Amino acid sequence: MAGFYGRDIISVRDLDRQALEEVFRYTEKFVKMTPSERRSVAGGRTLGYLFYEPSTRTRLSFQAAMASAGGTSLGIADVSSSSIQKGESLADTVRMMAMYSDALVLRHPLDGSSRFAAEVSDKPVINAGSGTEEHPTQAIQDLFTIRREKGGIDGLNIGVVGDLKYGRTVYSLLHALGNYDVKVSLISPEPLRIRTDSIYDIRTKLDFAESESLDEYVDELDVVYVTRIQKERFPDEEEYLKVKGSYVIGLDMLRKMKDGAIILHPLPRLDEISGEVDGTDKAKYFVQAEYGVYTRAALLGLVLNEGGF
């Protein structure tokens, strides 16, 4: 990928290691900037957002990132109060929002929605979650957190735990990790194993093993990336109830983990990480959420400014 200026950010598969490291460098630069320096990154620009699915952290972090970078944001966070409720097409909504903004952020329940939006928009489109496919800015945030908290990514042993079938953050994370020298353990209940097509896609890039047992690997892991089992993706609630609560990270599990190991979660969480873990030095999921503002600000700065900032 040659440069970010004016580019759509649809999939981490479009980002090689060099591109990811560029985002990380600019994120570190943004973190070190004074408030007045930050406001020059996107000053005078407007970010449009379209969220067809509920979102707290992703939407608010994009808004916070744009505000911190000196820009403004506007958009649709509740489709029930917009013309979408009247039957307006995705294409028309995207075209309309593109007229009001310099870049667009889209979350949509349908696979392929972000690529479609990029085809009809004359402004850069950033994928904030498309169906069960990908969530690229979450993966960037996740890798930055690992890099910052562990001092690097290469050589780490990373466990990805929970819903590997429906979790779009998982697919983006695994593809991004394929650019680094890491070992990955994919830990899930049998019904929530990573999809066969995705296994095929990452097999040549990633050293990984699959298991249903977290206990089997937890003492070897440098990073435990926990995901929520997503009730809303299940066609049958009974099937959800069979796997709900399959893994719970509590203090007993922490005692089995390596010194210096960290726990991440894309959030929101349900009961997969006990609240008693929050105050420990291994709990990095709230810091991870904070880093999302910085990584998104850096990404917006790269997309909106020729030659970076």
Swiss-Prot record:
Family annotation (PROSITE patterns): CARBAMOYLTRANSFERASE (PS00097)
Residues engaged in binding L-aspartate: K86, R168, R228
SUPFAM superfamilies cross-referenced by the UniProt entry: Aspartate/ornithine carbamoyltransferase (SSF53671)
Keywords: Pyrimidine biosynthesis, Transferase
Top enzyme class: transferase
Pathway(s) of this molecule: Pyrimidine metabolism; UMP biosynthesis via de novo pathway; (S)-dihydroorotate from bicarbonate: step 2/3
A Pfam family matched in the record: OTCace
InterPro entries: Asp/Orn_carbamoyltranf_P-bd, Asp/Orn_carbamoylTrfase, Asp/Orn_carbamoylTrfase_sf, Asp_carbamoyltransf, Asp_carbamoyltransf_Asp/Orn-bd
One of the protein's GO biological processes: 'de novo' UMP biosynthetic process
GO MF assignments: amino acid binding; aspartate carbamoyltransferase activity
Residues that, per the record, bind carbamoyl phosphate: R57, T58, R107, H135, Q138, L267, P268
EC number: 2.1.3.2
Catalysed reactions listed for this entry: carbamoyl phosphate + L-aspartate = N-carbamoyl-L-aspartate + phosphate + H(+)
Entry-linked HAMAP family: Asp_carb_tr
Described purpose of this protein according to its UniProt entry: Catalyzes the condensation of carbamoyl phosphate and aspartate to form carbamoyl aspartate and inorganic phosphate, the committed step in the de novo pyrimidine nucleotide biosynthesis pathway.
Similarity-based family: Belongs to the aspartate/ornithine carbamoyltransferase superfamily. ATCase family.
Oligomeric form and interacting partners: Heterooligomer of catalytic and regulatory chains.
Name of the protein in its database record: Aspartate carbamoyltransferase catalytic subunit
Protein source organism: Cenarchaeum symbiosum (strain A)
Lineage: Archaea, Nitrososphaerota, Candidatus Cenarchaeales, Candidatus Cenarchaeaceae, Candidatus Cenarchaeum
Gene symbol of the encoding locus: pyrB
